[in-house]
Every structure is written in structure tokens, then in C-alpha cells.
Amino acid sequence: MATSRLPAVPEEETTILMAKEELEALRTAFESGDIPQAASRLRELLATTETTRLEVGVTGESGAGKSSLINALRGVGAEDPGAALTGVVETTMQPSPYPHPQFPDVTLWDLPGAGSPGCSADKYLKEVDFGRYDFFLLVSPRRCGAVETRLASEILRQGKKFYFVRTKVDEDLAATRNQRPSGFSEAAVLQEIRDHCAERLRAAGLSDPRIFLVSNLSPNRYDFPMLVTTWEHDLPAHRRHAGLLSLPDISLEALQKKKDMLQEQVLKTALVSGVIQALPVPGLAAAYDDALLIRSLRGYHRSFGLDDDSLAKLAEQVGKQAGDLRSVIRSPLANEVSPETVLRLYSQSSDGAMRVARAFERGIPVFGTLVAGGISFGTVYTMLQGCLNEMAEDAQRVRIKALEEDETQGEVSLEAAGDNAVEKRSSGEGTSEEAPLSTRRKLGLLLKYILDSWKRRDLSEDK
């Protein structure tokens, strides 16, 4: 039997739907001519993003604020169960792992302080097993000295990335304000600190250093929000999913990025469902379990911090009642993601499933083959996309309620996605900015390649 060929796809056409290496693996499965194996590979790709580990080494000299930074990134207080130990003296004697409270596959490692008397740099690097970490946060409470430049050089030698996190800038600002009250300028002081750190890091061999000035006590100020978003942006494709979902939603930008990442999962989950339902392989559809839908929805719920533990923790941090935060949540999944709730939503989504499928078919005619095989793709896509949008909006409302921000709904609304964008485009309403085609086009391209390969396979068998 002749094997089917899945054409190569330009890299820029696959960055939203799936990473390049994922598509290559999928193409290999299709070229083998084993369609059930290809469908199984799709499920594996979806599951991989849920189990990818991320190891982050947090290093620096003693007393730099490493433990406090870890707590801030994990969204926990110093007295919360499982928080990294903090103190005025060195409290970390050996590498200590701190899994994220909600995502245990993401681990921040609190490394012992470097530069201690009697401990050479080489000995320190060996003791903390410097090579095991995916990337680093290099933390310093001062303007980058010999300890920091030595660590920076070693990280660069290993071919890895790091971000220089200058902590306790609030203390520097307060001291400068007291010393020079008449000519004090916060922006000027921060720029002076940044320039000095950049100069020292360039001397260590880093051409374009990433420097973040933060206060661990004020995660909404200075460069802390930028640290969070930059961390996500620079993660390799196979680490990005785990890293993003672990980040606290301290800014609207971080919330939007989290929603964009989960949007990829909506497409993958719907694609798996549609492919399996369309395949004429006995018993294959049964392998696609409703448990996957429940797990996806629970993942959205947890990722946006809408679960009871997250709401209670946020309420304590901002001095409000958890009930006040919960009062602005409107999603029917706010209380529980149960099989009964999912079944009801699934049934409701079936009403609009064919409309969504036909909207995709108008852009990619060959998609009709999949539509003819069943409406599972449209149903799953409609349901998950609607729930994702609702939960993202709930997370936005909770954020506004917690911080009491004076923002209008229009000013802070997250970018619309899913059915609304498809419907607007198919009906000719709105501009290209209102209904971006990039995600739809990428999904359509992959579906076209898959379905074309099936068609060629069928024709060769007929001959």
C-alpha cells in the first residue's frame, strides 16, 4: 500500500496550533500510512503539554531575597504552608524544590547562597548541580558584584538563559529619598541601578542582559509584571505551556497570555475529537473519553485561579472576603466541574456545532470531509471555547474586584476568540482586527493536510 505524504508546513504557519517538532512527529505518523497510530499520536501530543516539567534554579548570594522571590512567583505568603523559608540570615543550606501549589510539574529551586566564605565558585556549582536546571533567575540585592558575574558566566557557558533580578529596590528608593529629598527622582534612581547592572553583566559576556528591578513585597510594582511575561515569552516551545500556567495573574497582560496559551489547547482537543470521530476505525472513537473534556475544563478553572483555594488565598492577600470575590463570577462552572455539568454544556454546544464547522468549511473547503464524518469537532470546539471565554472574563472580574481598579469593561476586556470571531468573519461583519484569521487559518491548514493525505490514501487503495 502506498504511503500518504503530509506536506511540509512553513514554521510561521504552525507556531500557534502546535510547535514545529510536534507537527514533524505528526507528519511522520501520517507518512507511515497508519491512521490509528496518527490519531494516537495526536492524543499523545495533547497529553504531553499537561506533564512537561520545568526546573528553574533561583541563585544568588546569601540574603538576596531568593526565597521571597520564589514565594512571590508562586503566589504564596511567607507563612503559608509550603512557602520557602525566609529570614534575615541564610536559611537555605541545600537546594530546596518548591512545586507550584496548583501545578506540581513546575518547580522553583531555592539554591543555597553563593559566595560564602570557604566555598569556592567551582565547589558551589558542583554542590548545587548547576547543570540540572532549565533556566535561572540570578538574584541580587545590590548592583551586581563579583559573585553575580561569576554565576552569569557559568550559566552562559552552559548555553542557558537567565534573568538578572535586582531585588529590594524599594529600600534603595527610600534611602535615596531620605538622602536627597529635594532632587529625588524615582525614575532616575531606577535607571541608575539598571545601567550599573547592565554594565557589569556585559563585562561578564552577556551582550543583551535581561534586568528586572523588583520588590518581592510589591509584586504589582516596578518590573515584576514584566519579569513574569518575559519568562513566559522566552521559554522553549516544549516548556512554554507549563511555565505560563504557573504564573500568577498579576497583570491583565499575563491573564491574556494565559488565555492565549489555553486557546491552543482548545484547538488541539477539538482536533483530536474530530479526527477520531471521522476515522472509520472500529473502537477508536471510544478511546476519546469524556474525561478529557472534564480534565480540560478543570484545568481552565484552576489556571485562572477560580477554585476555592486560590480565591481564599487572594482574598487574604488583598484583605477581602472570599465571598466578595466569588460574587463577581458568572460562569456555570464556578462551583464545580462535574460530569453532569459537562454533559449539559456539551448538549447546549451541539446546537451551534454545525454552524462553527460550516464557518471553518467556508474558509477551507476540504474541511467538509471532516464535517461529513460527524460534528464532534464543532461541538467540542464550541463548548471549550465558550467555557474558556467565560472563565477568562470571570478571572478578569475577580482581578478588578480584588485590586479595586478603576477600569471600564471595555478598557480591560480580554481579546475575544473562538465562535464570535469565526461568526463575525463568516458573516462579513467587523474588521480584520475584530476577527483575526491566524488561528483559524493554522487549524484549517493542518486539517487540509490531514484530509488530503486521507484522500490520496483512499485513491491509492482503490487503484
Swiss-Prot record:
Record-linked Pfam families: IIGP (PF05049)
InterPro entries linked to this entry: G_IRG_dom, Immunity-related_GTPase-like, IRG, P-loop_NTPase
Transmembrane portions of the chain: none
UniProt key word Transcription: no
EC number: 3.6.5.-
Residues found modified as Phosphoserine: S246, S303
Superkingdom of origin: Eukaryota
Compartment(s): Cell projection, Cilium, Flagellum; Lipid droplet
Domain IRG-type G: 52-234
Gene Ontology terms: cellular component: lipid droplet; membrane; sperm flagellum; sperm mitochondrial sheath
Subcellular location, principal: other
A Gene Ontology molecular function term of the record: GTP binding
GO terms for biological process, alphabetical: positive regulation of flagellated sperm motility
Function: Required for sperm motility and therefore male fertility, via positive regulation of spermatozoa fibrous sheath formation.
Protein name stated in the entry: Interferon-inducible GTPase 5
